[in-house]
Amino acid sequence: MKTVFAILFLAFIALTYARSYEDVKEEIKNEIEKEILEDLEEESDELNDKSKEINDAKPWRWVRRIRWRKLVPYIPAVVAAAGKK
């Protein structure tokens, strides 16, 4: 009778270990996938940030948009107004 209980006990331990091993294996797999996805997300964010910095080939482009011919007549008036105290 003791041998039967011992065999059943060992079988129970083996089944429990097999289930927990599969659970642990699945959990490790999920953690690794999660870390990989987080790393990829961080790298894509870094690439997006770098592309924004590098993308602007002409940083003074907004200066060219100003219509200087329309603004030039007003410059003396602005200077005179700024010079008065």
Curated annotation (Swiss-Prot):
Expressed in entodermal epithelium along the body column. Belongs to the arminin family. Residues 19-57 form a propeptide. The keyword Transit peptide does not apply. Residues 1-18 form the signal peptide. Antimicrobial peptide with a broad-spectrum antimicrobial activity. Keeps its antibacterial activity under a wide range of salt concentrations that mimic physiological conditions of human blood, which is surprising, since Hydra is an obligate freshwater animal with nearly no salt tolerance. Does not affect red blood cells. This is Arminin 2b. It comes from Hydra vulgaris (Hydra). The lineage of its organism: Eukaryota, Metazoa, Cnidaria, Hydrozoa, Hydroidolina. It comes from the Eukaryota. One of its GO terms (cellular component) is extracellular region.
